[in-house]
Amino acid sequence: MGGAYPHVLNPRRGAKVALLASGRVRAPPQAIPAPPFPRELRWVNVAPLRMDQQRGRPVLVEFWDFCRVNSLRTLPYLSAWHERYAADGLRVIGVHTGAFAVSRDVDAIGAAVERLEIPYPVVADSELQIWDLYGNKGWPARYLWDQRGALYSLHYGEGAYEETEREIQGLLGVERDPVPPQRPEDTPGLLLPAQTEDQPGAYSGPYEAGGAWAVLSGRGEILVNGRAVEIAEPGCHLLVEHPHHRAGVLELSAGPGLECHMTCFTPGVPAPGAPAPPAA
């Protein structure tokens, strides 16, 4: 899951790095320095941080959006790494760059950070200033910087959680059992069927997935296959969840006061006896 891109171009150094098939990027032999955080940006849950003051510790920077399901699904791992390794020197920083008008509102970002109980610092990058400095390509994106402030590794999309944690441990000089998979579909090496692509607005029609989500703003009810779901805050909301990847039909209708910006689908583990998905 997540974007697959032929290369990433760092605009500060013009260094091209090769994207691996897994979505991971190998750092090039020449050092790529961590871009600074523009000082005028608002940090929603801590006093402003400066990247140059993080030297001597590894820093994990994650681009995310509370209205994108792929971003939400990485949060348990980021929170766990913060709790596990902050005392050893790791700094986890969330860069919130909204894809929708509602997720570019700084107050909405702050409310989402509180609601999601995010324990690590988050900066609101609503004008894509940090995004552009990084030459970032999608959500979520995970940049690991070493103690010198040089790029150590980069991953686009979900997954590779164990690999990232082992890299963190290597930089810190510690060795522990990694955070276990937070969902069955996160099991290392598991091949997942392809899910239906994201659809604009309130989608009604056939789909194949393990779950269906909707990006919603406003307050009100959305009908999901005739079932009323009350929405009280903006974000990406889970509407349908299956124990395994399956085909289904979705009927959505947003009521007064509610706007549906996108319908999203996530993969599920194959059902017992189902043919194995082809390798990527």
Report each predicted region and the residues it spans.
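Sec-exported extracytoplasmic/periplasmic mature domains
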Residues: 83-87, 114, 150, 169-176
